Amino acid sequence: MSYYRDMGNKYAQVPDIIIDFHGYTTFECQEAIDALIQEGGYKHIRMIIGRGKRSANGPVLPDFVKSYLTSQNIRFNQSKIQDGGEGSLEVFLK
């Protein structure tokens, strides 16, 4: 799993962890999301899901990840432009 921890300014609204799902299958995404939830300790996760512009059959991961998070009652929103825009999600766990 590709991920990065941000140890920057404690007052900045930065995610606890950033995960890049480029190149993942939907199954691998689901496993990674489930593992993060099980692992616990994360309240704010940035998921880089891409926009699917280069996918032969159109975007797959963006719709899948959004649908899966919704089915698990996990709150999320699109990242700000400077944080990835429509190719990235800000995910908030309790």
Report each predicted region and the residues it spans.
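Long, charged, low-complexity intrinsically disordered regions
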Residues: 1-94
